[in-house]
C-alpha cells in the first residue's frame, strides 16, 4: 500500500498539469524529410511566430522556382530561406500560408534578373493580363531580414488583402510608424503593413 500512494500522487500531478495546459501539451516538432538539414530548417523558422514554429512546413526553393520539402507541417504555415536571392537581403527568411506558394514562385522568378525595374515590370504585366497568382485573402506573411543574422530589422508582418482599398478597409494608404496601413491598394498585391512584432 505504501508504494501505491506515491504512484497515485504522481498520476494526479500529471493530470493536473495537463489540465492547466488546456488538457494537452504542445505537439513535439515534426521530423525532417530524408536528407534535409536541421540548420536549414532552423534558419527558415526564425521568421515564424514561436507558437506556429514546431508545426510549420519548411521548404527550399530551387533554381526552377519549384521547391523541395525539408519538413512537412500540419498548420498550413510554410517557411523558407530567401537569403542571397536577387533583390533580397543577405539574410532573409519568410513564412506564409501554403496557399501563397504559387505567388511566391512568381515573385522569385520576377526577381531572378536582379533588376528591380524589370522585376516590377514583369509583375505589373502579370497583374494586367490577369495571370498574377493572388494571395489568400487575410493570409499573413512573416518577414525577417538584414545584412546578417545578428543585424536583422524588426520582424515585419503583412496581411494579404488583394483588391482592398483605403475605402474598403478604412486604413490609410500612407506609411505610418505608429500603426497599420495599406500598401498597393486596389491590386492583387494589396496588403496591410504591420511594422514591428
Predicted features, each with a name:
Residues 1-4:
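Positively charged n-region of N-terminal signal peptides that target proteins for export
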Residues 7-15:
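Bacterial N-terminal signal peptides
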Residues 16-20:
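Sec/Tat signal peptide C-region and signal peptidase I cleavage site
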Residues 23-197:
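Primary mode marks residue(s) on the alpha4-beta5-alpha5 output face of response regulator receiver
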Amino acid at each position: 500500500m505504501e508504494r501505491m500512494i506515491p504512484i497515485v500522487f504522481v498520476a494526479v500531478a500529471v493530470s493536473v498539469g495537463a489540465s492547466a495546459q488546456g488538457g494537452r501539451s504542445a505537439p513535439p516538432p515534426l521530423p525532417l524529410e530524408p536528407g534535409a538539414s536541421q540548420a536549414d530548417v532552423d534558419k527558415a523558422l526564425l521568421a515564424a511566430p514561436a507558437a506556429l514554429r514546431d508545426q510549420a512546413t519548411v521548404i527550399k526553393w530551387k533554381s526552377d522556382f519549384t521547391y523541395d520539402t525539408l519538413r512537412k507541417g500540419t498548420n498550413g504555415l510554410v517557411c523558407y530561406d530567401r537569403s542571397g536571392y536577387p533583390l533580397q537581403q543577405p539574410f532573409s527568411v519568410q513564412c506564409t500560408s501554403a496557399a501563397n506558394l504559387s505567388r511566391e514562385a512568381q515573385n522569385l522568378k520576377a526577381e531572378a534578373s536582379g533588376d528591380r525595374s524589370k522585376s516590377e515590370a514583369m509583375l505589373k504585366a502579370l497583374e494586367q493580363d490577369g495571370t498574377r497568382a493572388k494571395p489568400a485573402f487575410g493570409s499573413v506573411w512573416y518577414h525577417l531580414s538584414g545584412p546578417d543574422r545578428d543585424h536583422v530589422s524588426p520582424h515585419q508582418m503583412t496581411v494579404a488583402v488583394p483588391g482592398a482599398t483605403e475605402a474598403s478597409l478604412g486604413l490609410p494608404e500612407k506609411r505610418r510608424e505608429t500603426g497599420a496601413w495599406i500598401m498597393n491598394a486596389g491590386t492583387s498585391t494589396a496588403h496591410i503593413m504591420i511594422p514591428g512584432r
